[in-house]
Amino acid sequence: MTEIPALAHTVTALIDASAERTFEFLADPMKVGNWALASMQAQPADAPGIYRGRSLFDGVQNHFAVTPHPQLLLVEYSVGPRDALTPRIRAQVIRAESVGLAAASCYLTLTAWRPIGMPAARWGRLCASHNVEIWLIKEQVEAAELREPAKEVRLKPDPQ
């Protein structure tokens, strides 16, 4: 096994789709259930803006909320017990022109912060999961791009 970072974990991928399409995918709570290994088969929970899914690891039901920031191309994921969701995961999309990429591509970075008290084994599993999840996101976004190339995506402004 590799050494696991103690405080945070970050993974980045090149996505062959526009930043807007990638952001739209990440901001859709129902799509989280297609790539987040701890929240598969996502569905709305019993409170507005809160969703639940099942962990592929142990079948436990997990809750999450999605807070998109369109102007920043940033999506914040709050996770934890339904009544105590905490923002611990972020997905940041970087536009092609910011880093000299081809126009129809972008970078995606997933970042997770380790809470104090999270056991090393669980943190290691989370880090390994993110290394897989970024591939799931990449493939699903790129497959959507192939099905609907040049789809114009207009982002809504950040909620006030």
Put a short name on every predicted segment.
Residues 1-47, 160:
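Hydrophobic ligand-binding cavity/cleft-lining segments
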Residues 81-143, 148-155:
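Beta-strand/loop substructures that line and gate deep hydrophobic ligand-binding cavities in soluble
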